[in-house]
């Protein structure tokens, strides 16, 4: 399978409707943004004829086709999984892309429904939310930590989360992930190598280091539910960016979701007072 991507050089508003039309003919397609350079909008996972797609998009001087790089994922199955998860999220949220129309309460409601459906034993749908919030919190200065925590606490007290019906069929990616695990083509840290992560030693916190060093023997390492949550969240962060949701709100979403399973405020307050990092679950799920 030879995938290509399309990078847009000009006004994305002109192409918005045409891009959405491609979802009907490109089963792996998803919308993304460059991570460096000009951060241009792009669509990836394209398999169709370039001339045919160009005719659909129109205004052919506003975009270019390039070959999809193959140096990030360990195998083609990982890339297809990546495409499928992004594609599912695009179909839910693309009406809000390149605009400022989405409500944060709706996104949090969606995340809560996803987390509840992914969780089957303990905290599979929530663990990565706490991990990402804690990684962010740990990078802040002492003053920033206190400031952000107080802002999040106040915002949390006032937020009214929307009841958002689950709009994604998670059975399909779960089945795919299970098959890939059984074939040794996927684990929790894919597409990265656990050995290389340990060797590099770039840990976000002591909790993160402890988790990484003991990962190979852990429950989450080859858990299809933990893996789906991690991959889905990484795709969701692209979706948030495309909806013009500020980065700080991304971490607030993590905070809100983590509060469902962990005493986040207590963990943060203890860290601020003692410098001790400790993660524990709420009693009702232990």
Regions found by a protein language model. Give the residues of each.
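An acidic, charge-biased composition feature
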Residues: 1-286
């Amino acid at each position: 399978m030879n995938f290509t991507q399309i990078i847009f050089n000009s006004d994305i508003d002109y192409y918005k409707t045409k891009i959405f039309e491609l979802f009907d003919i490109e089963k792996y397609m998803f919308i993304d943004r460059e991570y460096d350079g000009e951060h241009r909008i792009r669509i990836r996972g394209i398999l169709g004829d370039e001339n045919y797609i160009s005719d659909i998009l129109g205004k052919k001087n506003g975009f270019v086709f390039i070959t999809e790089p193959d140096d990030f994922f360990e195998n083609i199955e990982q890339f297809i999984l990546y495409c499928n998860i992004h594609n599912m999220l695009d179909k839910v949220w693309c009406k809000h892309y390149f605009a400022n129309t989405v409500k944060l309460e709706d996104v949090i409601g969606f995340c809560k429904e996803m987390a509840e459906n992914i969780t089957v034993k303990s905290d599979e749908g929530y663990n990565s939310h706490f991990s990402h919030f804690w990684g962010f919190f740990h990078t802040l200065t002492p003053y920033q930590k206190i400031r952000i925590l107080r802002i999040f606490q106040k915002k949390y007290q006032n937020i009214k989360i929307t009841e958002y019906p689950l709009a994604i069929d998670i059975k399909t990616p779960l089945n795919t992930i299970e098959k890939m695990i059984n074939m040794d083509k996927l684990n929790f840290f894919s597409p990265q190598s656990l050995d290389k992560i340990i060797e590099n030693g770039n840990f976000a916190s002591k909790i993160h280091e402890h988790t990484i060093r003991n990962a190979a023997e852990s429950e989450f390492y080859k858990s299809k539910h933990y893996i789906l949550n991690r991959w889905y969240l990484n795709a969701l962060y692209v979706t948030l960016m495309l909806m013009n949701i500020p980065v700080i709100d991304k971490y607030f979403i993590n905070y809100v979701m983590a509060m469902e399973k962990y005493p986040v405020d207590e963990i943060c307050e203890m860290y601020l007072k003692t410098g001790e990092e400790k993660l524990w679950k709420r009693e009702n799920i232990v």
